[in-house]
Amino acid sequence: MKVFWRESKSGQHCFLELDNGESVRVGFILRTPRGFDAVAQTRGYAPERSRNGFPTIDEARTFVESFHPWDEFGGVAGLEIEPGVRSRA
């Protein structure tokens, strides 16, 4: 299993890659005129996992990662995030 960030047209997406090769998006960051909006995905309703207006993409990424959203989608405890950001697919 791997957790990694990938560039997208409008920001970055965080993915959990499962052992069977399937990828699940577990978070994302959008560039906006006001900064960066970040969401750590969940299977339920949790508005505290979404926040707007981060001044930097690194702060937005730290916010998403703080929730460990991959744990909810099949990740294992202690899973490390791949360093860097992959280019768009």
Where is each model-derived feature located?
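Short beta-strand segments that buttress and anchor functional surface loops
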Residues: 15-18, 40
